[in-house]
């Protein structure tokens, strides 16, 4: 049914999640984490991160339903086979992602970077980006403290280039912000 692939965790990016089954003919509900949501359909092969390892698969058919995106994977032809898949994360190899402009970054590139503020000329370590959230107005960095940070507070820093985010240096694994550490 699926081809096992060698898992190189650092090369896999989660782009969605199979959340349940739809109907009796092997269709599954696919929650896409891409923006726009239908971008998940552009990637092939998809990699299912199962408890038995990473399995390669391809989408045979898809439909947009009121309940969301539903797909039928090649080799999954009945409800029993579909039930064996849910819930499972759906990933792709990083190499499938398109190149971005110099000042654009994928969220996974920002996660794990150290955040340093230069607020009022004082350089202080705020912690590490644990995740990035979409809020509608702008993305927000969730910064968690660690042994190097100035205190043990969690912080939410708006990802607004030039205003708050002054520099993202992937090679130095650091984001420089101008953010009041009291917030």
UniProtKB/Swiss-Prot annotation:
Stretches assigned to the PRC barrel domain: 102-183
This protein's encoding gene: rimM
GO cellular component term, pick one: ribosome
InterPro entries (UniProt xref): PRC_barrel-like_sf (IPR011033), PRC_RimM (IPR056792), RimM (IPR011961), RimM_N (IPR002676), RimM_N_sf (IPR036976), Transl_B-barrel_sf (IPR009000)
Keywords of this entry: Chaperone, Cytoplasm, Ribosome biogenesis, rRNA processing
Domain notes: The PRC barrel domain binds ribosomal protein uS19.
Pfam families in the cross-refs: PRC_RimM, RimM
Principal place of residence: cytoplasm
Keyword Transmembrane: no
Compartments it resides in: Cytoplasm
Subunit structure: Binds ribosomal protein uS19.
Molecular function GO terms recorded: ribosome binding
Record's protein name: Ribosome maturation factor RimM
Family affiliation: Belongs to the RimM family.
Function: An accessory protein needed during the final step in the assembly of 30S ribosomal subunit, possibly for assembly of the head region. Essential for efficient processing of 16S rRNA. May be needed both before and after RbfA during the maturation of 16S rRNA. It has affinity for free ribosomal 30S subunits but not for 70S ribosomes.
Coiled coil residues, start to end: none
SUPFAM superfamilies: PRC-barrel domain, Translation proteins
GO terms of biological process kind: ribosomal small subunit biogenesis; rRNA processing
């Amino acid at each position: 049914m699926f081809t096992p692939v060698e898992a190189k965790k650092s090369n896999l990016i989660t782009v969605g999640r199979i959340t349940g089954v739809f109907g009796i003919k092997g269709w599954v509900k696919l929650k896409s984490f891409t923006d726009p949501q239908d971008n998940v359909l552009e990637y092939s092969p998809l990699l299912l991160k199962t408890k038995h390892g990473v399995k390669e698969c391809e989408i045979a058919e898809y439909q947009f339903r009121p309940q969301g995106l539903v797909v039928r994977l090649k080799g999954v032809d009945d409800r029993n086979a579909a039930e064996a898949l849910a819930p499972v994360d759906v990933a792709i190899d990083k190499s499938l992602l398109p190149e971005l402009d110099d000042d654009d970054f994928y969220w996974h590139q920002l996660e794990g970077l150290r955040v340093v503020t230069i607020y009022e000329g004082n350089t202080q370590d705020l912690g590490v980006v644990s995740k990035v959230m979409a809020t509608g107005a702008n993305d927000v960095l969730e910064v968690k403290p660690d042994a190097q940070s100035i205190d043990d507070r969690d912080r939410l820093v708006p990802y607004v280039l030039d205003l708050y985010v002054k520099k993202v240096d992937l090679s130095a694994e650091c984001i420089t912000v101008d953010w009041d550490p009291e917030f």
